[in-house]
Design a protein with these regions (language model features):
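Extreme N-terminal starter segment of soluble prokaryotic enzymes
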Residues: 1-4
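Short glycine-rich, Thr/Ser-proximal phosphate-binding strand/loop in the N-terminal lobe
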Residues: 12-56
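Phosphate/pyrophosphate-binding loops at sites that engage ATP/ADP/AMP, CoA/4′-phosphopantetheine
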Residues: 68-83, 188-193, 311-322
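Short beta-strand-loop/turn "lid" adjacent to the catalytic site in phosphate-handling enzymes
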Residues: 70-120, 141, 147-156
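Glycine-rich phosphate-binding loop of actin/hexokinase-like ATP-binding domains
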Residues: 148-251
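Adenine-nucleotide phosphate-binding core of ATP-dependent small-molecule kinases
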Residues: 261, 268-272, 279-317
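Glycine-rich phosphate-binding loops at beta-strand->alpha-helix junctions
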Residues: 322-345
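Glycine-rich phosphate-binding/hydrolytic loop that grips phosphoryl groups
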Residues: 353, 357-395
Length: 395
């Protein structure tokens, strides 16, 4: 059985084709700059990689080329081999608590909820409509980023604002990266042979969120009404005093949208360091005895402190923790980042194994044997999680 996992952006379409018999990727790729000059696509398969410039006016054009190439490159013999298509969907509000078969109602809801994810939900609809046109008889499944967090109770998801903001306008914590956090919880539970774990999952890439998981369910998460809340990130501020917005509007002569744009795109590591949004660039100059080194250190220390603070908060919320998991670009690959966060948690009995912590992108325990909390690097695989959900729902 073969399933395609799809992540459709406003001008891009990322795919992975899985053979569900062994859960392996047969082919993957990316269609870029859809509807923009200079569009192209990349396909990786069988140890090879091709990149071709092509006119991609619409997402449907991209899907047609994708399916044509899967056959012409002998990746599959015919389109009949494709049993299902799983779509990453960003925002399902509190209506969608788990993955579901995509129906007209789902598509209508994605459009209805577009104000909650104005960049992503309309793009997700474009991806769905493209596959619907080209593969009309193949079932499609929607996997929502927000779904995993719908097990939070009111105490966790309500904001201390007028209740009517929630009841009338849907203002509440939704959380994101849910598919990744769910994959981490599933993987670590399977590896350790336990379902009743208290897990603190740290998805830290250019965007980042921390999630408290108990018995496989989300109890609390750091991102909120939007992905701007929570820990400091590559270009996002994370939590700030909301009064800063009106103050900066007055001081800089900006409107609210412009300030929010700065908090989303010019803050975080980039804003504090004035060097880069990439932790590798920060770590590269952090020991310099100059102004750049000073800037890098202040950004690194603030970043790791915000992550530490959420882990410590969730340790208390869960009544302790059995395991801390690091995942995504930074979590999987940055030895200095993990080392500093774990050093900050020493008062909880967390101890790092320096040699094990050198691991990059592999599943590995990085805490020492006498650490009171086990710490693991767990590579995430949202595409596989989408494929697994699709398989389950179409079987």
């Amino acid at each position: 059985m073969k399933i395609i996992s799809i992540n459709a952006g406003s001008s891009s379409l990322k795919f992975s084709l899985f053979n569900m018999d062994d859960k392996k990727v047969i082919a993957s790729g990316l269609f870029e700059r859809i509807g923009i000059d200079g569009s192209s696509y990349t396909i990786k398969y069988n140890g090879e990689k091709i990149k071709i410039e092509a006119e991609l006016a619409t997402h449907t054009d991209a899907v047609k080329i994708l399916l044509d190439k899967l056959v012409s490159l002998n990746i599959i013999k015919s389109l009949d081999e494709i049993d299902g298509v799983g779509h990453r969907l960003v925002h399902g509000k509190d209506k969608y608590k788990e993955s579901c078969l995509i129906t007209d109602e789902v598509v209508n809801d994605l459009t209805l909820f577009k104000d909650f994810a104005p960049l992503h939900n309309p793009a997700n609809v474009l991806g769905i409509e493209a596959f619907k046109e080209v593969l009309p008889d193949v079932p499609m499944v929607g996997v929502f980023d927000t779904a995993f967090h719908q097990t939070m109770d009111e105490e966790a998801y309500l904001y201390p604002v007028p209740y009517s903001w929630y009841s009338e306008h849907g203002v509440r914590k939704y959380g994101f990266h849910g598919t990744s956090h769910r994959y981490i919880a599933k993987t670590i539970s399977e590896k350790l042979g336990r379902d009743n774990l208290r897990i603190i999952s740290c998805h830290v890439g250019n965007g980042g969120s921390i999630t408290a998981i108990k018995d496989g369910k989300c109890i609390e998460t750091s991102m909120g009404f939007t992905p701007l809340a929570g820990i400091m990130m590559g270009t996002r501020s994370g939590d700030v005093d909301p009064s800063i917005i009106t103050y900066v509007m007055e001081q800089e002569g900006l409107n609210a949208k412009e300030v929010i744009d700065i908090l989303n795109k010019k803050s975080g590591l980039l804003g504090l360091s004035e060097i880069s949004s990439d932790m590798r660039d920060i770590v590269g100059v952090i020991n310099n005895d100059d102004e750049q080194g000073k800037k890098a250190r202040r950004a690194f220390l603030k970043y790791t402190r915000t992550v530490t603070n959420y882990i410590a908060q969730y340790y208390v919320l869960l009544g302790g923790a059995d395991v801390i998991c690091f995942t995504a670009g930074l979590g999987e690959n940055s030895e200095p980042f993990r080392k500093k966060v774990c050093e900050n948690l020493a008062c909880l009995g967390v101890k790092i194994d320096s040699e094990a912590n050198k691991v990059m992108g592999e599943f590995k325990k990085i805490s020492s044997d006498d650490s009171t909390i086990s710490v693991y690097v767990v590579p995430t695989d949202e595409e596989l999680m989408i494929a697994l959900d699709t398989l389950k729902l179409i079987s």
